[in-house]
Amino acid sequence: MPMEILEERGHLLTEQTNPQSQNLDQLSSLELVDLFNQQDQLTVTAIAGAREDLAAAIEIISDALAKGGRLFYIGAGTSGRLGVLDAVECPPTFCTPSELVQGILAGGASALLRSSEGLEDIAADGAQAIADHRITQLDVVVGITAGGTTPYVHGALDAARARGTKTIFIACVPESQAPCQADVNIRLLTGPEILAGSTRLKAGTVTKMALNILSTGAMVKLGKVYGNRMVDVAVTNRKLEDRAIRILRDLTDLNREEAAELLVASGQRVKLALLMHWSGLSAESAQAQLDRHGGNLRQAMDAAP
């Protein structure tokens, strides 16, 4: 039986060698730090180059969430772990239910702690993940793959599209090297890595930057913030309780003790506390007002009696 010939991947931007780091093994510690710092500047440039696609993705995600859909990140290895990381931060930051933003990682929870890179080669597993999560046309699926070719991710996106689901593709190679028929193609071109092929470096950094923008941007559109304050923060520990009190103090004329009392009266809900204070409404009436305006504090306040 003839030996299977592996597909050549050397043409991919993320697999190429970086001419700036050819003497990597000869650098001093300070020179290493300087080189990393220099190369990491390219992540900012890459985000700027994808600004219109990132904005389009925010619109798709926020529209879907506003209509009762969910956001799913799906990936393998570092890319998948970054999706999980961004997803699990949404409930404490924006008080969202855990099912609203979810990260799907090839290999499941165990792959968070132990590398399971071989699982990324199975496209059928990606498709099965879409079925297992009962993804529908109301949802949005964001496929993340630094090199742009991961079968697990493409299998998931193909299955999602077949269900009428909106799809977004994030890769760190040009579309000509790894095409994908997604609704939005986000290409974060940071160039070859300092350590050739190690996409946990610049590619990982720029991917996390992009996910920060997508999730936070969508939550801003959904009214989860007021100004630049996280008024939907879930008060689940002393640090977050202190933050909630400081938000109330900064946005009202209350002292710290009064702000703490208001927070208690609102059931530890900053957004509700602010509307109660500004409008004079009871907690029940203020909550009803927020509900009428989809939880948007600014709109609820503008319409308050």
From Swiss-Prot:
It is an enzyme of class 4 (lyase). PROSITE patterns: GCKR, SIS. It holds the Pfam family GKRP_SIS_N. Its EC number is 4.2.1.126. The active site is at 89 (proton donor), 120. Residues 61-224 form the SIS domain. The keyword Lyase applies. Transmembrane segments: none annotated. PANTHER family: GLUCOKINASE REGULATORY PROTEIN. Specifically catalyzes the cleavage of the D-lactyl ether substituent of MurNAc 6-phosphate, producing GlcNAc 6-phosphate and D-lactate. This is N-acetylmuramic acid 6-phosphate etherase. It comes from Synechocystis sp. (strain ATCC 27184 / PCC 6803 / Kazusa). The lineage of its organism: Bacteria, Bacillati, Cyanobacteriota, Cyanophyceae, Synechococcales.
